């Protein structure tokens, strides 16, 4: 974790994932090999404007929804991810996005609110990568396959 980053005790972070400076993370699970940039806010408290009061005095009465972030996810600079969102493996969140809804595996989203831009790979390639589950390999196997992992997806056809 970098300086000025706050990671609350109710956060689980997978192996090899990192969080850059000035980020705030609570109430979430982050998979392995995730890259989280600076100024990222994950699962900040949301005020329920449907209640009589929006004041956090009633927060102890509310159940917060956990954020789930898959493996090998890239979260760019100054992103906000609201509570309850699920982000699939290999997804990319563009800089400055506010993520209010789930993001599918290998989907690229951006904007306020975050919207679909495109998928990183074809559906066939995504299925192969999901089946491969390389992030579950041990460190020896990963080191032996660095050349493979640094190639484009043409190799999996």
Cite the ranges covered by each PLM segment.
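Flexible, glycine/small-residue-enriched loop-and-beta-strand segment within the central core
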Residues: 2-14, 18-83, 112
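Proline-centered helix-kink/hinge sites
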Residues: 38, 104-105, 113, 133
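Glycine-centered loop/turn positions within well-structured domains
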Residues: 50, 101, 105-107, 115
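C-terminal segments of enzyme domains that contribute to small-molecule binding surfaces
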Residues: 55-81, 113-157
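Catalytic-loop signature of eukaryotic-like protein kinases
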Residues: 72, 90, 107
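Beta-rich strand-turn-strand
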Residues: 78-91, 97-101
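Conserved G/P- and acidic residue-centered "switch" motifs that form tight phosphate/ATP-binding loops
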Residues: 93, 111
